[in-house]
Amino acid sequence: MPSVTISSTMLAGLLLMLVPASSAAPRPQAREDVPMRLLQDAKPAFPYDPNTIAKCSWWWDNEGQIPCANMPAEWGITMQDFLRWNPSITSSCGNFLNGRSYCVEASGEEPPVPGTPTTTTAPATTTKPSNGITTPQPIQDGMVGNCNKFHYISEGDRCQDILSYQKITLADFFKWNPAVKSDCSGLWSKTNACVGVVGQAPAVTTTTTKPATPTTPSNGITTPQPIQAGMVGNCNKFHYISEGDRCQDILSYQKITQADFFKWNPAVKSDCSGLWSKTHACVGVIGGQAPPPTPTTTKPTTTKPPGNGVTTPTPTQPGMVTNCNKFHFVSPGNTCQQIVSYQKITMANFVKWNSGAGSGCNNLWGNTHACVGVF
């Protein structure tokens, strides 16, 4: 029988094959055939469920390359582990959303309590519960289970847009989609929200139905419906908010101050982001008196800041700096960009000198003077 010569390299390879595998699994890596930028890391790049396991040591930033049902095989884990680490995902892989980060490894996790195994059934495109209603995927986090009508959230949609289109109330929408939150900050685009439930028909407002009004209170003032959320109870003058109305438009028309408007309608918020169309806002209260309108023939009063010798015209933008030496009268309809271009200044400086305008310039007030230059 001829002799066989074994090289040292071959011998090392044979020895490695005989050594038992280590009990610690290697860090999971995505398959090479997955289109890659770096989608896995020790820190999440996208928003993630706050109930994700605290001891997560490796994350997958989901951009849709790997279906939910394939995640365990891709990362060398079980579906039970994956669902336990990421409780926002349902047993049928619902709520596995693009643009979210998910845990694919947990170091130092306590052994799970034995129980009913989690299903590993591949997710269907839709879920059909016992009530016979097909639920499209993905859905808003925390959506109720008895939903029978859905609305797909497109990029840029606002809660107000959905309520107006679906003819449902704000209270019902938040009740059926609790994770959206009362300020609508949890509304996720490219998901489906609940806009109707089994056993409850949303109220539809028709053009022939007069808006309901509550019983006239003891002060004799009838409050029209619907109203801005959180509106004060001693209101005696109301303004109907049409589509496209801005806080500035209402203040100018009603000749009231910004401070009073926000005090009487606190849910509107200081940046006017909570102003709901097709509702009534309070623009006057019992015992309160709105400031009289400024006559068009009256020259705006001026003040002279001490020491700098510069006369400051009034009224001015809220939050304007005190060391301003150049001013621009803001006409109704002017935008920050128009002023910046005309005055040859930067947007950063304009917002810094007129902080009340807001970083997005959403609170630029017409018929006031803005600062466009400083000492």
From Swiss-Prot:
Ranges where the record places region Disordered: 108-139, 206-225, 287-317
Keyword line: Chitin-binding, Repeat, Signal, Virulence
Keyword check for DNA damage: no
Gene Ontology terms for molecular function: chitin binding
Changes seen on gene knockout: Does not affect virulence on Arabidopsis, N.benthamiana and tomato.
InterPro entries: LysM1-like, LysM_dom, LysM_dom_sf
Domain of life: Eukaryota
Record's compositionally biased regions (Low complexity): 116-129, 206-217, 296-317
Disulfide partners: none
Domain LysM: 57-104, 149-195, 237-283, 326-372
Entry's free-text remark on domains: The LysM (lysin motif) domains are small globular domains involved in binding chitin in eukaryotes. Vd4LysM contains 4 LysM domains.
Family: Belongs to the secreted LysM effector family.
Miscellaneous field: In plants, chitin acts as a microbe-associated molecular pattern (MAMP) that is recognized by lysin motif (LysM)-containing plant cell surface-localized pattern recognition receptors (PRRs) that activate a plethora of downstream immune responses.
Protein name from the UniProt record: Secreted LysM effector Vd4LysM
Native species: Verticillium dahliae (strain VdLs.17 / ATCC MYA-4575 / FGSC 10137) (Verticillium wilt)
Lineage, top ranks: Eukaryota, Fungi, Dikarya, Ascomycota, Pezizomycotina
